[in-house]
């Protein structure tokens, strides 16, 4: 009996593998928090018997069956933890330059892939599905066209106009602040006017600059001159996965092919390294975790800022875990520094009290999942909007990166740690965030395999995705109505003038006859 069950189990495994799809995932992106979102899905798909080929900068430490990696981490132009404070100031002050940098970085990713002989070897391979990231350009969309395979895109941020627009999903600037803005949901007239300007600017920049002539020229050099325009391929995207959830973001109208998977990267906490475990276990007053993400080098901040953090932390009864690049830096006795910390596992520890963060989307969602209140120091991109939304919910306070004094840091940390309402509201938000019919990972897996089964999901797409921009905005209808109204007014005016003229002419004739 046991032998028959073993044979049946082996047969099931073989059948699931033989029916597995060939999937290509394109994630050369150099921010590990961005890749973590895709990684959770890709590893699960591989475990379910699909053959997953992934271009990545973060290869697995241990081989995963059915997951075949093309490691581009050593490529020129890719660098993790590379943003220094001086460059950070430029990014903060110039949103337009920030967006152009996103576009240039996306093209760099494509150049790295297109110049890699291992990627060239799979260019003509037949894939059943292609998965890519929404960032600054879709110069890699040609892989889906080459295989005649459906395309799924993943956005590791809250909803952006350029991501929603490709799916035919409404993105209304009247109540949807653009991702870089600091506007509230309820905007006044001037904020709505500025928001509309930014909204149109980003749409133009993404589709006509990010996916414009230069991107097409580069892609056609790799895929062939018969490749369609990038935007044409992008508007055929089958699904968009968005790493957010309506409980932490304002509710949006979403079409069926835009699916929220907020928190897909959050895992069950694993045992911590012994030193960190001991440090946290023995923290009588709890632990504060401080990191500004994988992109920014905290050690390059001005000396007075670093000193302000040291002095503030020294006065706290809590212990502090600080992600800091220079591990030889002299620190207070209650501070443990490392170049890297297992963030997800730290959040799962019972003694964690607060999270000092830049407000990056992935880390913020981990904090929400585990119910850890936030002291936010937003730097760029979506981080201000993320932190401001948490401040509005009463689960975070905001610190200005250009005003990081000892007193400000101490005041913010003490407020969040000592005022229990922050922790209580974050735990309530965590319950809302977790309360779903399916886990975000199960949701993503289901819809990915749905697209594979049906060879695309174009039946989920609204007709809005195929309208010209002036049709989508009803500018042609509005123009017609205005012209018709003006013509009607002109005709009425002409008739009235004619009638008046006729009346006065008749009156004059009558008077002349009487005289």
Swiss-Prot record:
Its EC number is 2.4.1.-. Glycosylated. Residues 21-471 are lumenal. GO terms for cellular component: endoplasmic reticulum; endoplasmic reticulum membrane. It holds the Pfam family UDPGT. Residues 1-20 form the signal peptide. It is found in: Endoplasmic reticulum membrane. InterPro entries: UDP-glycosyltransferase, UDP_glucos_trans. Residues 493-515 are cytoplasmic. Gene3D superfamilies: Glycogen Phosphorylase B. GO terms for molecular function: UDP-glucosyltransferase activity. It is a single-pass type I membrane protein. GO terms for biological process: organic acid biosynthetic process. It catalyses: kermesate + UDP-alpha-D-glucose = carminate + UDP + 2 H(+); flavokermesate + UDP-alpha-D-glucose = flavokermesate 7-C-beta-D-glucoside + UDP + 2 H(+). The chain crosses the membrane at residues 472-492. Disulfide bonds: none annotated. Glycans are attached at residues 51, 236, 303. Keywords: Endoplasmic reticulum, Glycoprotein, Glycosyltransferase, Membrane, Signal, Transferase, Transmembrane, Transmembrane helix. Belongs to the UDP-glycosyltransferase family. Membrane-bound UDP-glucosyltransferase (UGT) which catalyzes the C-glucosylation of kermesate and flavokermesate to produce carminate and flavokermesate 7-C-beta-D-glucoside (dcll) respectively. Carminate is used as a deterrent against insect predators. Carminate, also known as cochineal dye, is used as a fabric and cosmetics dye and as a natural food coloring. This is UDP-glucosyltransferase 2. The gene is UTG2.
């Amino acid at each position: 009996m046991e032998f028959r069950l073993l044979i049946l189990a082996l047969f099931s495994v073989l059948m699931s593998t033989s029916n597995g799809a060939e999937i290509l995932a394109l994630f050369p992106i150099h921010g590990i928090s961005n890749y973590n979102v895709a990684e959770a899905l890709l590893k699960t798909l591989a475990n379910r018997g699909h053959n997953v080929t992934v271009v990545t900068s973060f290869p697995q430490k241990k081989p995963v069956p059915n997951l075949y990696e093309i490691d581009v981490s050593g490529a020129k132009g890719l660098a993790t933890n590379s943003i220094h404070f001086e460059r950070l100031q430029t990014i903060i002050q110039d949103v337009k330059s920030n967006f152009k940098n996103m576009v240039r970085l996306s093209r760099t990713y494509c150049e790295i892939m297109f110049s890699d002989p291992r990627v060239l070897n799979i260019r003509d391979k037949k894939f059943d599905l292609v998965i890519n990231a929404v960032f600054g350009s879709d110069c890699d969309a040609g892989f889906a066209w080459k295989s005649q395979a459906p395309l799924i895109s993943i956005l590791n941020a809250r909803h952006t106009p350029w991501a929603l627009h490709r799916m035919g999903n409404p993105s209304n600037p009247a109540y949807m602040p653009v991702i870089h803005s600091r506007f509230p949901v309820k905007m006044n007239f001037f904020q709505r006017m500025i928001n509309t300007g930014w909204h149109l600017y980003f749409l133009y920049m993404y589709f006509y600059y990010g996916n414009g002539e230069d991107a097409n020229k580069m892609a056609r050099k790799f895929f062939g001159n018969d490749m369609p325009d990038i935007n044409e391929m992008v508007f055929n995207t089958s699904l968009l996965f968005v790493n957010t959830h309506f409980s932490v973001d304002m509710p949006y109208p979403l079409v069926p092919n835009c699916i929220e998977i907020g928190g897909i990267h959050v895992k069950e906490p694993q045992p911590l390294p012994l030193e960190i475990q001991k440090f946290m276990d023995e923290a009588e007053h709890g632990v504060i975790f401080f990191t500004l993400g994988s992109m920014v080098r905290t050690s390059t901040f001005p000396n007075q800022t670093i000193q302000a953090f040291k002095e503030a932390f020294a006065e706290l009864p809590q212990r502090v875990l600080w992600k800091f690049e220079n591990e030889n830096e002299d620190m207070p006795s209650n501070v443990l520094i490392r170049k890297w910390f297992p963030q997800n596992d730290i959040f799962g520890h019972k003694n964690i009290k607060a999270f000092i963060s830049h407000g990056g989307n992935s880390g913020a969602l981990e904090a929400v999942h585990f119910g850890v209140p936030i002291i936010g120091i937003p730097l760029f991109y979506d981080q201000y909007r993320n932190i401001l939304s948490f401040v509005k919910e009463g689960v975070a306070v905001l610190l200005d990166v250009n005003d990081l004094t000892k007193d400000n840091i101490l005041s913010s940390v003490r407020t969040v740690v000592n005022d229990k309402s922050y922790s209580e509201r974050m735990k309530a938000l965590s319950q809302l965030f977790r309360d779903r019919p399916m886990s975000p990972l199960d949701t993503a897996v289901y819809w990915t395999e749905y697209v594979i089964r049906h060879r695309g999901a174009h039946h989920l797409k609204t007709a809005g995705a195929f309208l010209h921009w002036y049709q989508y905005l009803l500018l042609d209808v509005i123009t017609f109505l205005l012209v018709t109204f003006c013509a009607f007014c002109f005709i009425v005016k002409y008739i009235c003038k004619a009638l008046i003229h006729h009346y006065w002419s008749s009156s004059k004739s009558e008077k002349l006859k009487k005289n």
